[in-house]
């Protein structure tokens, strides 16, 4: 990876503006304070899908809930590449910020937004063309196919707003602002609830209403956050310069993460394919479970995002020892927090599942999944934080290989083996903790290998 140190007049106002915020002070305190808005922001982001499911599952029924769950994962797959590229933009920007290179911070923001805009337009077109065949490939039951196609075609219009929001949020986090994305998402979450009530409850628009509600909310958050970023960094008065060298740096870091995200999503599509073969109750149970597990996974993601920014800024500032210390403190803290949280949710699983669906058969299947996976989520915290150290330092290729091997290849192989032995929903659920353990071992091993090697840190 590249670390860039540029001599700048430390007394200049612009340099003060770009003073890094995670390169000094108490490590764990700074990590926690930065991660809290990230968690809250991700929580509100999940409201888009969760509120849709609450309205769909309780007002329209389990078939429509299954239609929403079996189709929305395709959007995740499509935007996976640009999710990684947005992280790459954040890593590059964070290192420039840590090095106090204000000119390249500005250029990084401009070129990252350009990448997001073009990519979002292209992916929306691809999604609209492929959505029908993709749902058939997933073996979505014919009883819910029409509703799944209807939901997906409208939902695909959210791709461009999602990408632009993710890009803007990643950049703001890179320069130390995790609060603004949260506030924008909170507003978008409230808007989403209102739109669901209008489109589903009042106008009776079925799954189309759920998709429209999400689209409107995503557009709102994307426009507000992107405009805020452009105005805050005073980009409107600048002549934007498309810098192919900088775009290459962002893509070099981001594409492996994007490929990682896409392949991971594809492996989840394979799992979804097997889930779809169990029937409507199990499809609905897994759809609801994936919403409930977000209460655990969202703080894990927040810890990982905070670590990426922390590592990026400290590498830019040349403070390697802080990274080594953070690896121990933040991993321990994250594992303890997630262990306690998963235990609480495990004890209250039935009540939480009932919020999403009143069907007792679906709840019973959901509880089977929870009892298998929730006790092991602390492993997921360790793999995410350790992997984020590597990603923040630019070792994105290594991260990609580990994820492909453990969370994709190993997961699918184990799934097939377990289903041969026992064709049950419990067999499907078991693949998750097993693959987490495999990934955690590989990530920790990779970190131990690189942490004392100088080639862990490169130069722009």
Language-model region placement:
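Short alpha-helical transmembrane segments in multi-pass integral membrane proteins
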Residues: 1-35, 93-158, 202-255, 311-376, ...
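Residue-level signal for short hydrophobic patches within transmembrane helices
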Residues: 24, 28-47, 51, 74-81, ...
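Transmembrane helical elements of multi-pass membrane transporters/channels
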Residues: 33-52, 154, 165, 188, ...
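Helix-terminus/linker motif at the lipid-water interface of multi-pass membrane proteins
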Residues: 47-66, 135-142, 198-205, 262-295, ...
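Alpha-helical transmembrane segments of multipass membrane proteins
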Residues: 50, 125, 167-171, 190-198, ...
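Interfacial/gating helices of multi-pass transporter permease domains
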Residues: 56-76, 142-150, 207-208, 249-253, ...
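Small-residue-rich hydrophobic transmembrane alpha-helices
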Residues: 65-125, 162-181, 285-349, 380-403
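Short runs within selected transmembrane alpha-helices of multi-pass transporters and secretion channels
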Residues: 86, 154-173, 181-189, 210-225, ...
């Amino acid at each position: 990876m590249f670390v860039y140190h540029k001599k700048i007049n430390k007394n200049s106002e612009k340099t003060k503006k770009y003073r890094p915020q995670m390169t000094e002070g108490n490590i764990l305190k700074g990590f926690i304070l930065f991660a809290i808005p990230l968690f809250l922001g991700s929580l509100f982001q999940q409201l888009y899908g969760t509120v849709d499911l609450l309205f769909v599952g309780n007002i329209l029924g389990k078939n429509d809930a299954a239609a929403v769950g079996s189709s929305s994962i395709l959007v995740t797959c499509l935007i996976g590449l640009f999710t990684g590229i947005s992280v790459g933009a954040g890593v590059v920007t964070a290192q420039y910020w840590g090095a106090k290179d204000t000119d390249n911070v500005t250029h990084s923001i401009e070129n990252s937004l350009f990448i997001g805009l073009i990519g979002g337009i292209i992916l929306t077109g691809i999604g609209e063309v492929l959505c029908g065949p993709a749902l058939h490939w997933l073996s979505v039951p014919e009883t819910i196919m029409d509703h799944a196609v209807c939901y997906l075609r409208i939902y695909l219009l959210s791709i461009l707003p999602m990408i632009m929001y993710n890009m803007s949020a990643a950049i703001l986090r890179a320069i130390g602002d995790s609060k603004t994305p949260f506030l924008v998402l909170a507003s978008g979450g409230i808007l989403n609830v209102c739109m669901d009530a209008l489109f589903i409850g009042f106008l009776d628009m079925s799954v189309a209403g759920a998709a429209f509600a999400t689209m409107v909310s995503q557009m709102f958050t994307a426009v507000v956050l992107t405009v805020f970023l452009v105005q805050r960094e005073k980009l409107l008065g600048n002549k934007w310069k498309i810098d192919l060298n900088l775009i290459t740096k962002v893509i070099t870091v981001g594409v492996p993460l994007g490929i990682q995200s896409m392949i991971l999503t594809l492996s989840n599509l394979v799992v979804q394919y097997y889930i779809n073969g169990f029937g409507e109750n199990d499809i609905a149970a897994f759809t609801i479970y994936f919403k409930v597990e977000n209460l655990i996974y969202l703080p894990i993601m927040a810890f990982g995002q905070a670590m990426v920014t922390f590592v990026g800024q400290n590498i830019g500032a040349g403070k390697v020892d802080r990274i080594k210390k953070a690896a121990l403190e933040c991993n321990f803290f994250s594992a303890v927090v997630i262990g306690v949280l998963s235990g609480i949710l495990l004890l209250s699983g039935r009540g939480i599942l009932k919020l999403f669906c009143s069907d007792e058969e679906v709840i019973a299947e959901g509880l089977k999944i929870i009892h298998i996976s929730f006790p092991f989520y602390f492993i997921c915290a360790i793999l995410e934080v350790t992997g984020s150290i590597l990603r923040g330092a630019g070792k994105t290729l290594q991260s990609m290989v580990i994820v492909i091997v453990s969370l994709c290849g190993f997961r699918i192989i184990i799934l097939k083996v377990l289903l041969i032995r026992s064709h049950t929903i419990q067999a499907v659920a078991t693949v998750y903790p097993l693959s987490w353990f495999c990934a955690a071992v590989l990530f920790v091993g990779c970190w131990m290998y690189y942490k004392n090697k100088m080639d862990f840190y490169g130069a722009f």
